[in-house]
Amino acid sequence: MGLSFSGARPCCCRNNVLITDDGEVVSLTAHDFDVVDIESEEEGNFYVPPDMRGVTRAPGRQRLRSSDPPSRHTHRRTPGGACPATQFPPPMSDSE
């Protein structure tokens, strides 16, 4: 099985976005595609009845951009690879 675009004819495709012949920018999602049998490409038959259409797999996790703020649970390492030593004041003696 493969995916075939079922919408407007693309003239440019980059990063899951296409520009239609009318200049409209369209963001692509898995729902914009029809499931097709790749072997049917040789026969030239790309039509898939609506009852056979479906998403074959869920979209993957999106990667974080470097401009995104870090999560509260994200642990960042120092350039040396180790956690920095915590600086505690010296213990107080009985004479103080």
Curated annotation (Swiss-Prot):
It is found in: Virion tegument; Virion membrane; Host cell membrane; Host Golgi apparatus membrane. Keywords: Host cell membrane, Host Golgi apparatus, Host membrane, Lipoprotein, Membrane, Myristate, Palmitate, Phosphoprotein, Virion, Virion tegument. Myristoylation and palmitoylation (probably on one or more of the nearby cysteines at the N-terminus) enable membrane-binding and Golgi apparatus-specific targeting and are essential for efficient packaging. Phosphorylated. Phosphorylation does not seem to be required for recycling to the host Golgi apparatus. Packaging is selective for underphosphorylated forms. The modification Phosphoserine is found at residue 40. Residues 44-96 are annotated as: Disordered. Its main location: virion. This is Cytoplasmic envelopment protein 3.
